[in-house]
Swiss-Prot record:
Protein source organism: Musca domestica
E.C. designation(s): 2.5.1.18
Subunit architecture: Homodimer.
Domain GST N-terminal: 1-80
Keywords carried by this UniProt record: Transferase
EC class name: transferase
Protein name, entry field: Glutathione S-transferase 1
Catalytic activity field: RX + glutathione = an S-substituted glutathione + a halide anion + H(+)
Amino acids binding glutathione: S9, H50, T51, I52, E64, S65, R66
The GST C-terminal domain, residue ranges: 86-207
PROSITE patterns the UniProt entry points to: GST_CTER, GST_NTER
Length: 208
């Protein structure tokens, strides 16, 4: 399977950790966005939205990291532990995935990206949205070792990619004890943590 990615990208890292958990070897293809490689005709044929990560499995192409994660588990998982078939368990996992995409990671992008890529000043109102997102995550994790129940799922891997990116941005987790405890545990149990952290350090270079 071909996997178009950037090591520093949190969505790409979440897929890499999922593949590691499944024992899948991906044929990694580094895409240089600054050089416009994602806009070349050959890549646009694969993904007209020209985004990363993008997975090509035979004649099937898929993008959006959380969709890729679920696809890999459903097609290649020897068990359903990362994305259980139980409708209620799966619904909670989906909620966490959508929360990561639409609230937590979005708060990172909205606050930090203008500072990194447009040299804009920090917006305190957008920082409040980060704090709100972490308040929610802290509540979700109350009484739970993992993000969507009592075992590791794709929700944890997606959230881990995001939260670790906040760490290299020097965000202080100390006000969120449940998040801090979960994060410390995930660093030890998540497959592919080392590669994820190496990617975080790549991304950290943007902060100067």
């Amino acid at each position: 399977m071909d996997f178009y990615y950037l090591p520093g990208s949190a969505p790409c890292r979440s897929v890499l950790m999922t593949a590691k958990a499944l024992g899948i070897e991906l044929n990694k293809k580094l895409l240089n966005l600054q050089a416009g490689e994602h806009l070349k005709p050959e890549f646009l044929k694969i993904n007209p939205q020209h985004t990363i990560p993008t997975l090509v499995d035979g004649d099937f192409a898929l993008w959006e990291s959380r969709a890729i994660m679920v696809y890999l588990v459903e097609k290649y998982g020897k068990t359903d532990s990362l994305f259980p078939k139980c409708p209620k368990k799966r619904a909670v996992i989906n909620q966490r995935l959508y929360f990561d995409m639409g609230t937590l990671y979005k708060s990172f992008a909205d606050y930090y990206y203008p500072q990194i890529f447009a040299k804009a000043p920090a917006d305190p109102e957008l920082f409040k949205k980060i704090e709100t997102a972490f308040d929610f995550l802290n509540t979700f994790l109350k009484g739970h070792e993992y993000a969507a129940g009592d075992s590791l799922t794709v929700a944890d891997l997606a959230l881990l990619a995001s939260v670790s990116t906040f760490e290299v941005a020097s965000f202080d987790f100390s006000k969120y004890p449940n998040v801090a405890k979960w994060y410390a545990n995930l660093k030890t149990v998540a497959p592919g943590w080392e590669e994820n952290w190496a990617g975080c350090l790549e991304f950290k270079k943007y902060f100067g």
